[in-house]
Structures are given as structure tokens and as C-alpha cells.
Amino acid sequence: MILNCNPFSGLFLSMYLVTVLGNLLIILAVSSNSHLHNLMYFFLSNLSFVDICFISTTIPKMLVNIHSQTKDISYIECLSQVYFLTTFGGMDNFLLTLMACDRYVAICHPLNYTVIMNLQLCALLILMFWLIMFCVSLIHVLLMNELNFSRGTEIPHFFCELAQVLKVANSDTHINNVFMYVVTSLLGLIPMTGILMSYSQIASSLLKMSSSVSKYKAFSTCGSHLCVVSLFYGSATIVYFCSSVLHSTHKKMIASLMYTVISPMLNPFIYSLRNKDVKGALGKLFIRVASCPLWSKDFRPKFILKPERQSL
């Protein structure tokens, strides 16, 4: 792997910590506030969990390599990165689609919302998506395991991205490439089409609304989601469908960095800055932590110096 970025080790560590802390705060805020126990925030907390796992697949290994000043990654570690990146990337994709469908039903069919979007159905869908991605990732890894690689092969990337790994294989990768593009098309284009259709219906419904308050609330919620969708799908499309246009290795790495690191890091800020409910829940969470008895004076450690007994 290409790792000549020692000056940026602190930057990547900071980005990783900000991502984990930000998404963890979203999960804690949603779980600790009963007012946020609805489907929209259920999806958001799931997305935060997936984003933590997504960035944890690549950055820790990269930081270890930078610290040890090596570029090595074992074959098993590379297969593991391919497996988990495919799984968590696919789950990001599915969750963004479900969130778009949730907004579509809430805005366009509010009277039937509780019937169409119920917690049991959505939890079952998420579980089904996890199983689908586990199977797809396993097939990718099994097909990749049949390929031959030379010892000391350099992957022109900062992690084992499937498309880049296939390019350095010494055996025929036709089946791998066909499966990769078919799966990427089905699991990428179909959800993207669903998101576009949902927002086209949402836009037409918003134009018919007379209440400016309702419009603002819908725009703020949908605007945050659209920012995340644009960032994730835009960078992923460049990597998987426009790789022939990006002849520079560094441009491909920057595009990959956008959806594997930047997008998970920005998601908590995008969803919280324009959302009064999330900001309120975070404020209550901070107040609860600050007023915890653990930090009060009575719970500070005390040491009592006892006089030693003098022997007669």
C-alpha cells in the first residue's frame, strides 16, 4: 500500500477520533431521549453505527503502518478489509435508501405512515440487508481467494479496495470484475433510483404545501439527507464507474477518501447542525453527564493520613 504520508498521521488520527466520537454521540443522544424514539432517528443511529465500523476498517491499520514506518499488509488482513468495506459500504447504501423512503412516506402519505413504516418491518428489512451484504462480501472474498498475487505486490492505495486489488492480480480477473460491476450496479443504481424518485415526489408535495413552517421543517430534514447522499454517492460513483477517467492514482485515492473517511466524519455534523431535536438531545446528554454524581465533590477521592502507632 502507498503510505508516504507521515506528516498526516495526526490528521488522520484526529479525523478518526472525531468520526467515532461524533457518531457515538448521535447513538447515545437517540437512545437516551424518548422523544427521538422514532424511525427517522432509528435509521440515523444505525447509520452512525455503520459509519463507525466503516472507518474503523481502514484508518487504524493505516495509522499502525505509519507509526511502524512499514507499508505491509498481510493477505488475510487484505481479504478482511475487502469483506468489511463491502459489507459496511453496502449497508450505508441501504440505510440512506430507507431514510429517503421514510421521508417520502412521512411527507407524501402522512396518514398512512404508521401502517407503511412500522418498526418491526424496518428492523426486518435492516436485518435482511445485513444478511445480503454478508453473502455478497463472502462471494467477493471467495472469488478473490482464487486469484494469484506475487509476494511484495504494491497496491496503489491506502487500503485494500476491491477494484485496486483486482488490478494487481497475476491471474484472470474477468469473473471477479463482472461480479463486482453487476453487484455494484444492482446495489448502487437501484437504491439511487429509489432515492431520486422519492425526492421527486417529495419536491412536488412541498410545492403544494401552504404552511411555511411545514416546508421549512421538511426542507431542513431532507436537505441534511441530500447532503449525505450527494457526498456518498458522488465519490463512490467516481471510484467505481469513472475510474478510467481518473488516470492519476492520487485522484482515485482522494475520491475513495471522500466516501470512506470524509462522509462518515461529516454525517453527525450534517444531521445535528440543522436539526433542533438532535441538538436538544445532545444538550441534555451533556447536562446529564456533567451533573453525574461521579464528578461531584462528594465522589472525589479522599485520602486520610492516619498516624502510625508508636511501639513502646
Curated annotation (Swiss-Prot):
- Places the protein is found: Cell membrane
For the keyword DNA damage, the answer is: no
Has keyword Lyase? Answer: no
Topology of this chain in the membrane:
Multi-pass membrane protein
Kindly list the GO CC terms recorded for this protein.
plasma membrane
The record's listing under Pfam families reads:
7tm_1
GO terms (molecular function) for this protein are: G protein-coupled receptor activity; olfactory receptor activity
Residues with glycosylation annotation: 148
The entry's note on the tissues where this protein occurs is: Epithelium of the tongue; including the taste buds.
* Coiled coil feature spans: none
What cystine pairs are annotated?
A: 78-160
Residue ranges annotated as Extracellular topological domain? 1-6, 61-81, 140-177, 242-253
Entry's transmembrane regions: 7-30, 39-60, 82-101, 121-139, 178-200, 218-241, 254-273
Keywords noted in UniProt: Cell membrane, Disulfide bond, G-protein coupled receptor, Glycoprotein, Membrane, Olfaction, Receptor, Sensory transduction, Transducer, Transmembrane, Transmembrane helix
Q: Which Gene Ontology BP annotations are present? A: signal transduction
Residue intervals annotated with topology Cytoplasmic = 31-38, 102-120, 201-217, 274-312
Tell me the function of this protein.
Possible olfactory or taste receptor.
Identify its protein family: Belongs to the G-protein coupled receptor 1 family.
Q: What is this protein called?
A: Olfactory receptor 867
Organism, per UniProt? Rattus norvegicus
